[in-house]
């Protein structure tokens, strides 16, 4: 199974996107492809061959749509359209640009979804059993099932016609309820989920000025050519 990761963001977070991807490539040595979903045809810095930049501006939501203006950016909803944006990929790991891979986590790419369409880490403060609400910052997504079952289009549809507090995340949880595998919190450790000591992926969810943290700054200043050689 291909190990494919996806990041998405507007121009103001391109540097963060690069830093997050560098942390992934530094720790995980079996990555086949990294996609950067951006607003431009070219990235402002030269990228290694494993990284491909795709301009998705206006390809999944239109200015003026009900959730286009939200506390984050319209690009947060790109994850709802991955089944269309990446028609040749069967499965991807979506990561927010404010995530840092702390330790090798190659195994998550091959995790058994047990027939579910996505896997995510629960937000215990946002839900009451039996409703499981997952944080969308790290998602293992079966794009093939999202396409064949129509769930991807359903997520896009509800996000474009119904006002939601957290548009992308709410749409995913509404449509994929009962079709979501709960992942170990080590794969999305944050104040919104849990903070296990052995976390493999840390998510700076809701953290202001996260780029000022030493680890994030180290990856922001790291050269692509040094990703596999540098010690952090």
Residue ranges and their predicted role:
Residues 33-39, 120:
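Short internal beta-strands
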Residues 38-43, 104-105, 124-125, 186-189:
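Short, polar loop motifs at secondary-structure junctions
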């Amino acid at each position: 199974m291909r190990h494919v990761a996806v990041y998405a963001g507007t121009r103001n977070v391109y540097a963060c996107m690069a830093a997050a991807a560098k942390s992934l490539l530094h720790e995980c040595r079996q990555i086949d492809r990294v996609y950067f979903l951006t607003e431009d045809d070219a990235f402002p810095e030269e990228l290694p061959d494993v990284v491909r930049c795709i301009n998705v501006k206006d390809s999944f939501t239109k200015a003026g749509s009900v959730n286009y203006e939200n506390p984050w950016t319209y690009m947060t909803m790109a994850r709802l359209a991955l089944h269309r944006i990446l028609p040749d990929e069967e499965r991807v790991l979506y990561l927010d640009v404010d995530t840092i891979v702390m330790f090798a986590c190659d195994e998550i790419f091959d995790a058994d979804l047990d027939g579910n369409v996505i896997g995510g880490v629960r937000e215990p403060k946002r839900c009451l059993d039996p409703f499981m609400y997952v944080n969308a910052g790290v998602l293992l997504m079966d794009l093939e099932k999202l396409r064949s079952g129509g769930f991807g289009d359903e997520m896009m549809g509800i996000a474009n016609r119904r006002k939601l507090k957290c548009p992308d995340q709410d749409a995913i949880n509404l449509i994929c309820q009962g079709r979501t595998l709960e992942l170990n919190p080590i794969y999305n450790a944050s104040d919104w989920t849990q903070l296990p000591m052995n976390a493999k992926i840390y998510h700076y969810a809701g953290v202001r000025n996260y780029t000022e943290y030493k680890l994030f700054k180290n990856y922001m200043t790291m050269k692509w050519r040094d990703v596999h050689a540098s010690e952090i």
